[in-house]
């Protein structure tokens, strides 16, 4: 599960900036330059059909196309706002019931609205509340098959 304001699903053809940190998830899915896709071992690390993305609100146009083409499941903030967070949590849990025996959660602090957590590298208004994030992580922990998790892009010097 990828919880992030940004897609990190660009490749060299879709990235408007060329920043490598915007290509890491696509590279893990086997898309992009061989120098990235073949780190540690050759080829795909994660089947993109098993990626569930929650909370994005700043996707590049080419990145959106690449995610859709690859089969990534995306619950953008616009979808969360329309359907309600509790409904999306149910859909995420159902997704993992079908798609994964074990789950890694990547939680980027910029998924949170900077009103609640400004201590991140790329703050972007319109994100999850702290309560929504706690609910999501609590529900993920309760299903019992989260094998690992990482909390990334934390900048305490900018936090309150």
Residue ranges, per PLM feature:
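Active-site histidine-anchored catalytic micro-motif
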Residues: 1-38, 143-147
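Catalytic cores of soluble, metal-dependent hydrolases
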Residues: 66-69, 73-160
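Short, glycine/acidic-enriched loop or turn micro-motifs at the edges of active sites
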Residues: 7, 58, 109-113
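Conserved beta-strand scaffold positions in the cores of enzyme catalytic domains, especially
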Residues: 2, 51-53, 74, 148
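Aromatic-lined glycan-binding groove of carbohydrate-active enzymes
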Residues: 48-50, 57-62, 99-103
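Active-site flanking residues adjacent to catalytic metal/cofactor-binding acidic residues
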Residues: 3-5, 54, 105-109
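Solvent-exposed alpha-helices and their adjacent loops that cap or buttress functional pockets
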Residues: 18, 42-46
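A general structural motif
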Residues: 32, 52-60, 129-131
């Amino acid at each position: 599960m990828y919880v992030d304001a940004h897609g990190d699903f660009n490749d060299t053809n879709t990235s408007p900036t060329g920043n490598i940190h915007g290509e890491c998830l696509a590279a893990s899915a086997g898309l992009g330059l061989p120098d990235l896709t073949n780190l540690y071992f050759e080829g795909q690390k994660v089947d993109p059909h098993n990626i569930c993305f929650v909370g994005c609100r700043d996707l590049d146009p080419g990145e959106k196309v690449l995610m859709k083409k690859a089969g990534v499941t995306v619950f953008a903030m616009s979808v969360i706002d329309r359907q309600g967070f509790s409904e999306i949590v149910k859909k995420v849990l159902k997704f993992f019931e079908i798609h994964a025996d074990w789950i890694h959660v990547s939680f980027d602090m910029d998924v949170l609205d900077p009103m609640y957590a400004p201590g991140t590298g790329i703050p972007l208004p319109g994100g999850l509340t702290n309560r929504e994030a706690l609910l999501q992580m609590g529900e993920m922990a309760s299903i019992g098959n989260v094998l690992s998790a990482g909390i990334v892009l934390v900048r305490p010097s900018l936090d309150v």
